[in-house]
């Protein structure tokens, strides 16, 4: 089949087509010229990542920041107000002083202070609405299942400014993502074209925010056995303190793919979001935008997108069985979860295994987790061989060896990272 035929056979984007708010070339230049004369609002790192995702079509069918009715429906019903599935609010906040100056129909320039370009985008104001402390707490309880300020996602929401601004956006910058992560950072159009060139139709996405260790490799290879290919898709936006930067993680993946994967069955990519640490809800978001990237399946393992002990080890799998069904395929989530049980290194099996394949006991097993990898390396300890491939472990050891002491944080092991909760 031709590349175009292969493209046509890929899973449809959420909403039926890719909605892209990013401008290019002369049109972008004209928009920037206009934006420089507009009032300006500073946006956060998270908001900038969301703006870029809307720009490249990753958040299709969204074309702007959410109105209050959409925000409320997403929190309570997992859908936009029109019934289209969406699991996490995509909002932009402003101060009370800024809110008083904004009017419906007004256009405002958006700027992220670390953007390498002068203007990040614009928004045409549709609605300005207050977010009281009670509103924010409701969002946190619905999305993160907690209002505990120690939860990094909760902390971000509670620190947001007191008003949200809704409206259609125009994205005028992708920041440094295409330059810093050249060849890795990928738009949905680019991933779809890559899949079509490879002749793939069924694709499993592997979400990564930690260095790729043996459990990740095991998950990816399970997926390759049942799908045409696996898309190793790394977050290249901001993480919490103590997490390993994307450029280091990308090197680890490169080393693994180069020596331990059949190259025609794997593709590495990156996406521009900040991590929300939303556990089950974020797992749904990961599946939603992977549909836009062209993936039919989303690998969901233990404690997907989790942090601390806020979620059960497989809550992120269970939530897929609870989301609303819509008869209209354009309005429902089409990408399916690939649910995988506890994975670990078993000394008696002499390799990676899962509860479905290993008959041995807890004492024979070693849980391989990103948290454990970061904790041991940050404490100057040497990781056992079964935690990762030698090539990637060397990259990680070199990173920690040269890490400024002021950037080191104490890493606590949650119970799922130790395997205590495993049967």
From Swiss-Prot:
InterPro entries: ATP-Sase_PUA-like_dom, PUA-like_sf, Rossmann-like_a/b/a_fold, SO4_adenylyltransferase_pro, Sulfurylase_cat_dom, Sulphate_adenylyltransferase. It catalyses: sulfate + ATP + H(+) = adenosine 5'-phosphosulfate + diphosphate. The record marks 213, 216 as: Transition state stabilizer. The active site is at residues 209-210. Pathway: Sulfur metabolism; hydrogen sulfide biosynthesis; sulfite from sulfate: step 1/3. Keywords: Amino-acid biosynthesis, ATP-binding, Cysteine biosynthesis, Methionine biosynthesis, Mitosome, Nucleotide-binding, Nucleotidyltransferase, Transferase. The keyword DNA damage does not apply. GO terms for cellular component: mitosome. Sulfate binds at residues 207, 209, 305. This is Sulfate adenylyltransferase. It comes from Entamoeba histolytica (strain ATCC 30459 / HM-1:IMSS / ABRM).
